[in-house]
């Protein structure tokens, strides 16, 4: 056994090609010929005649060589001799004195029933003699191992068995499960397979045939050509040992040997097949092709699997028309391999059925020779499930440089020949606009390619075979499309109304136009024919219809969350500081006689002011004539010294602490909007600031102060609809100067000078301002002018902690400020002031 392990051989499909058979003309009379040549010719003629008598299909007979013909002939005669003895004894017992015609009819039924039993059997029948020769194997062995019936009959069974299981198989062939017993010491071991020679017994030495000692059930691994993973398939052998009659074998001395035992077993796969495998294994079919793979015939099972009749299958031309485009080059490679070696090997690909569906098959094709030359192709195909097909597709090793989805045009050295639905880049130019490339390189047609090429077979296929069925069968009616289009066009407006902002509305409209460009435009131009347009085919290929689009848009609409939308008009100060300031203002005890708290409904947030500004153009707030005199009150700045508002004073230079305060002033309240119910209330302006380490230089300025909010918050007004003002807009630090200015129309003898400042342009946009007022009132000061008589630093406040007083001149009363005056004719307001230096005023810095 050790000596045979070095030379292990397994059964394979490789066969010797037969010698070329040519019909020689009969030599004329009188011409001498070679006697050995005549003998060989007569022998070949008899072998051909003998091969035609074998019970095999013609395609199997044509591939047999001389030794195979002789081997199968002997096997057939032995099998016929056995069945003659076995069937004669059994038929005589069963029939008795029955009518011969009736008995013949019963034999026909038995033969037909046996064929059906083989198809229903999950396995194949195997008969092995005691000397390990395959006496019989059913034709269904091809479905499990891939070997033809003619390949294994009268061959050694050890060529099919794994080397590690050969000893076990020989042990099962012995009646006592002990093949080491050797009654004849002259018998040696089998040098070919390393196993001992079989022992022949007389029937008297053996137990009865129906004894339980003769039953066998074991597992063995057999060579399998259909399994690409390991090459072996574990089979379960279940049967019994029986006598093999009618063999007429002789011993070494020439004496006739009695019938010997043989294993009659049914081999079934150890792993039971799935339900789908049981369904597909019975539909192995064969097709006949020309050398260029043009189909010329198909058996009955192939017609059941594919749905074509034999005439329909043969009238379409090249067989590549039935192969999926992604598998054409893969099958062409197998075709070339078959031309070189005579056999294609296993190939898994998709075939087109009559109902335009793709069926996965596992095929093996080989040449059939006639007179030593290839005559036609026989392809054996086994249907596979979709799961098995996809698994083989993933395991497929792509050896070709181009695939269907990447390089067909390069492979065939032509521009893209595929229809728009099959083009990897389906970008088509608009009608009437053609580039230079399209003019110089025309698209190939069916007439410009070779009719027998793969490209021609691909172009002859219908586009619809590569389209998946749509998810819904609802027709694309024009009224349905119009209704869906109207519903889609109304969605952005509804979304904008929910959001309450025009910006969101424009964004939604723009987004809808970008996402659905096919819906923008004339329907009659885009969809002249709903059944033939490219968009319909693409949507049908993706399995999407208008109902699906409607559902997706509804899901996107109802799933939108507008609570997290941030408006660009939101203020920059954080919510915590706003809350702190609002609480401080609400808790501040303002005891001035003219002070009245404004209702909170008008001062909830700056959004109401923004809403009012967006509703219409701004209105000039009318000024009221009544003046409210209030007592000095402590300002909000006393509380702001304990906090920092977004680092407002981070960039200010604190050279020296300067205490300052502000005198009492009489100001006039005003209303921002005439339609507010709180606009008629009077609000004071009082300010007093504690010691703050902030100093700032300032220069004479000229500015028109816009209405200020009452809550010391930064307001960002969207002033897109406002007209630009011809008056300048300066920094926020200069807004504090205007509180000391009075109209120029009043007479003041203290300061005859007047400084003229060139006006600047006020741009319409987002106006941001800070104010320092305790009350929620809106105040508006006219344009005022601050002119120091002597250049240099001047004090802004007149009251300091050291008791120093600054005498300044203020108007006795502020006249009515009429806001109805045109902005281009507003007179400058003049305010005389007297500057006096103080010892504790280090620098003229101003907040």
Swiss-Prot record:
Gene3D superfamilies: Helix-loop-helix DNA-binding domain, PAS domain. One of its GO terms (molecular function) is E-box binding. Keywords: Activator, ADP-ribosylation, Biological rhythms, Cytoplasm, DNA-binding, Nucleus, Repeat, Repressor, Transcription, Transcription regulation. GO terms for biological process: cellular response to 2,3,7,8-tetrachlorodibenzodioxine; circadian regulation of gene expression; negative regulation of DNA-templated transcription; negative regulation of T cell mediated immune response to tumor cell; positive regulation of DNA-templated transcription; positive regulation of transcription by RNA polymerase II; regulation of adaptive immune response; response to xenobiotic stimulus. The keyword Ion transport does not apply. Residues 50-82, 117-125, 264-266 are annotated as: Required for maintaining the overall integrity of the AHR:ARNT heterodimer and its transcriptional activity. Residues 38-66 are annotated as: DNA-binding. CDD domains: bHLH-PAS_AhR, PAS. A motif (Nuclear export signal) lies at residues 64-72. A motif (Nuclear localization signal 2) lies at residues 37-42. Mono-ADP-ribosylated, leading to inhibit transcription activator activity of AHR. One of its GO terms (cellular component) is nucleus. Residues 27-80 form the bHLH domain. SMART domains: HLH, PAC, PAS. It is found in: Cytoplasm; Nucleus. Residues 346-384 form the PAC domain. The keyword DNA-binding applies. It comes from the Eukaryota. A motif (Nuclear localization signal 1) lies at residues 13-16. Residues 440-452 have a biased composition (Polar residues). Residues 120-173, 281-336 form the PAS domain. Its main location: cytoplasm. Homodimer. Heterodimer; efficient DNA binding requires dimerization with another bHLH protein. Binds MYBBP1A. Interacts with coactivators including SRC-1, RIP140 and NOCA7, and with the corepressor SMRT. Interacts with NEDD8 and IVNS1ABP. Interacts with BMAL1. Interacts with HSP90AB1. Interacts with ARNT; the heterodimer ARNT:AHR binds to core DNA sequence 5'-TGCGTG-3' within the dioxin response element (DRE) of target gene promoters and activates their transcription. Interacts with TIPARP; leading to mono-ADP-ribosylation of AHR and subsequent inhibition of AHR. Ligand-activated transcription factor that enables cells to adapt to changing conditions by sensing compounds from the environment, diet, microbiome and cellular metabolism, and which plays important roles in development, immunity and cancer. Upon ligand binding, translocates into the nucleus, where it heterodimerizes with ARNT and induces transcription by binding to xenobiotic response elements (XRE). Regulates a variety of biological processes, including angiogenesis, hematopoiesis, drug and lipid metabolism, cell motility and immune modulation. The PAS 1 domain is essential for dimerization and also required for AHR:ARNT heterodimerization. This is Aryl hydrocarbon receptor.
């Amino acid at each position: 056994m050790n000596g045979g392990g070095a030379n292990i051989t397994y059964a394979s499909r490789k066969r010797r090609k037969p010698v070329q058979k040519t019909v020689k003309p009969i030599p004329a009379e009188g011409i001498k010929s070679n006697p050995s040549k005549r003998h060989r010719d007569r022998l070949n003629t008899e072998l051909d005649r003998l091969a035609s008598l074998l019970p095999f299909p013609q395609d199997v007979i044509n591939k047999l060589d001389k030794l195979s013909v002789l081997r199968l002939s002997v096997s057939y005669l032995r099998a016929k001799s056995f069945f003659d003895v076995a069937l004669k004894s059994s038929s005589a017992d069963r029939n008795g004195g029955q009518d011969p015609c009736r008995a013949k009819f019963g034999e026909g039924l038995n033969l037909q029933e046996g064929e059906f039993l083989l198809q229903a059997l999950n396995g194949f029948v195997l008969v092995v003699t005691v000397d390990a020769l395959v006496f019989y194997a059913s034709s269904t062995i091809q479905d499990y191992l891939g070997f033809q019936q003619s390949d294994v009959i009268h061959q050694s069974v050890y060529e099919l068995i794994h080397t590690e299981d050969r000893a076990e198989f020989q042990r099962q062939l012995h009646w006592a499960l002990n093949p080491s017993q050797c009654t004849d010491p002259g018998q040696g071991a089998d040098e070919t397979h390393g196993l001992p020679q079989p022992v022949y017994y007389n029937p008297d030495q053996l137990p009865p045939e129906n004894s339980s000692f003769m039953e066998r059930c074991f597992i063995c691994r057999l060579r399998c050509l259909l399994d690409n993973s390991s090459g072996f398939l574990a089979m379960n052998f279940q049967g019994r040992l029986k006598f093999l009659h009618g063999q007429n074998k002789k011993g070494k001395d020439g004496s006739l040997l009695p019938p010997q035992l043989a294993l009659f077993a049914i081999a079934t796969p150890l792993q039971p097949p799935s339900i789908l495998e049981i369904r597909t294994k019975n539909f192995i079919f064969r097709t006949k092709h020309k050398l260029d793979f043009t189909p010329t015939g198909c058996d009955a099972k192939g017609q059941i699997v594919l749905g074509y009749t034999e005439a329909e299958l043969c009238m379409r031309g090249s067989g590549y028309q039935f192969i999926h485009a992604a598998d054409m080059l893969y099958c062409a490679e197998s075709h070339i391999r078959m031309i070189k070696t005579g056999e294609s090997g296993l190939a898994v690909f998709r075939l087109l059925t009559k109902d335009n569906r793709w069926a996965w098959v596992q095929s093996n094709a080989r040449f059939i020779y006639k007179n030593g030359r290839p005559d036609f192709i026989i392809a054996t195909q086994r249907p596979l499930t979709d799961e098995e097909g996809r698994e083989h597709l993933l395991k497929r090793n792509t050896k070709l440089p181009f695939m269907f989805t990447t390089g067909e045009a390069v492979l065939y050295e032509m521009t893209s020949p595929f229809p728009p639905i099959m083009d990897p880049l389906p970008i088509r130019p608009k009608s009437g606009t053609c580039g230079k490339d399209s003019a110089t390189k025309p698209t190939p047609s069916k007439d410009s390619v070779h009719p027998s090429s793969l490209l021609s077979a691909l172009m002859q296929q219908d586009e619809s075979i590569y389209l998946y069925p749509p998810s819904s069968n609802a027709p694309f009616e024009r009224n349905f499309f119009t209704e869906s289009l109207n519903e889609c066009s109304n969605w952005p407006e509804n979304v904008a109304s929910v959001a309450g902002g025009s910006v969101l509305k424009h964004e939604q409209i723009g987004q809808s136009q970008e996402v659905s460009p096919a819906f923008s435009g004339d329907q009659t131009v885009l969809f002249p024919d709903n059944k033939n347009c490219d968009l319909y085919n693409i949507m049908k290929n993706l399995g999407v219809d208008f109902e699906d689009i409607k559902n997706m848009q509804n899901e996107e609409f109802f799933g939108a969350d507008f609570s997290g939308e941030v408006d660009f008009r939101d203020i920059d100060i954080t919510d915590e500081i706003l809350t702190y300031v609002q609480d401080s203002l609400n808790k501040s005890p303002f005891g001035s006689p003219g002070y009245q708290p404004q209702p909170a409904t008008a001062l909830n947030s700056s959004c109401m002011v923004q809403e009012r500004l967006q509703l219409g153009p701004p209105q000039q707030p009318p000024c009221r004539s009544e003046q409210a005199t209030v007592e000095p009150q402590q300002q909000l700045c006393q509380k702001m010294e304990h906090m920092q508002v977004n680092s407002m004073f981070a960039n200010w230079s604190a050279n020296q602490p300067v205490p300052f305060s502000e005198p009492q002033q009489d100001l006039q309240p005003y209303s921002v909007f005439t339609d507010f119910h709180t606009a008629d209330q009077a609000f004071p302006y009082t300010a007093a600031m504690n010691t703050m380490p902030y100093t700032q230089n300032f220069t004479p300025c000229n500015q028109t102060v816009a209405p200020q909010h009452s809550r010391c918050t930064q307001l960002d007004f969207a002033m897109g609809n406002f007209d630009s003002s011809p008056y300048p807009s300066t920094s926020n630090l200069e807004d504090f100067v205007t509180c000391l200015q009075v109209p120029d129309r009043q007479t003041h003898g203290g300061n005859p000078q007047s400084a003229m400042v060139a006006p600047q342009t006020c741009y319409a946009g987002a106006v941001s301002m800070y104010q320092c007022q305790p009350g929620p009132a809106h105040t508006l000061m006219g344009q005022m002018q601050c002119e120091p008589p002597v250049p240099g630093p001047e004090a802004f406040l007149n009251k300091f902690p050291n008791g120093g007083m600054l005498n300044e001149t203020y108007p006795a009363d502020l006249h009515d400020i009429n806001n109805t005056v045109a902005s281009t004719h507003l007179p400058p307001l003049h305010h005389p002031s007297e500057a006096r230096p103080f010892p504790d005023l280090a620098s003229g810095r101003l907040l």
